[in-house]
Amino acid sequence: MHIDRVVYLPITEDTVRLANLKSGGLDLIERALATDIKDIRSDPKLRLATALGIGYWGLDVNVGNGERVKNPLGSSAKVRQALDAAIDREALNQVVFNGEFFPGNQWVSPENSYYQQAFPVPKRDLAKAKALLKEGGVTAPFDVDFMVPKGAEPQAVAEVIQAMAAEVGINMKIRVTEFATSLKQAEAGEYEAYLLAWSGRSDPDGNLYSFHKCKAPLNYPGSCNPEIDKLLDQSRIPSDTGQRKAIYEKLTKLILDNEAILYLYHPRVLIAHTTRLEGYRQLSDGLVRVVGLTLK
């Protein structure tokens, strides 16, 4: 049966969405939880469509956006590098997402052709983290205001990061905030660290330029480096992939050294639907396309 009408129903609670799908109240839900994958796959009336997303989750650090930069994390790249070294990305993926997502440390995933292999996902190193804190002239412990969007998965991620960072004396004080409010506060510089996702773009420029260019609209950390700006502009000129990769390699080193954004992982797009719905195919951009779908 061809579909004549599509009804979109906003349901914010993850458990309610899945319950409605199971009961037949819905035919498809987007953004299923990774922890629900086993349950969905075991249900003969449900199907799971997945794709590795083109976006990422990362931790923004306020390094130049207002008065809230006056703290150890915002003032020193060494301290930000210490926080990075304290995070075990693979453990984070296993604990929160049952290993279903993709640990990362750049604005594109390790499966992307523009991923810089010279800068692989780092292993957790507590000794290095403590040494970097010392190099940064910081005496631990110290507190960090950690703004986190409301939601089961972001809050779980934040709690894991909090536990890991505490082992080197970085006390991440989680402040759960409604998503729309958190964006306004981030833009205004009313935070010290902010857990944030980006849906991603097919070209790496869409994951990079507006986040690291001086005074760019999505540069919530307020980072500004003339050398990074120059390379960002240069990266937009050539159409040759090899030339662009060479520029991105230089950019990657500068951006990872500065750590205004700590890239953490790349989510999978998880779409669950009933077996009544046929013809659904998921692409990496995360969009739900209804053309060609039928109900039996």
Positions of the model-derived regions?
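Active-site-proximal polar cores
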Residues: L264
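Short, loop-centered acidic/histidine patches that primarily coordinate divalent metals
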Residues: P267
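Long beta-strand-rich cores associated with HINT superfamily self-processing modules
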Residues: I271-K296
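Extracytoplasmic/periplasmic ligand-capture domains
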Residues: M1-V96, N112-N258, L293-K296
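Mature extracytoplasmic/periplasmic domains
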Residues: N98-A118, L270-T275
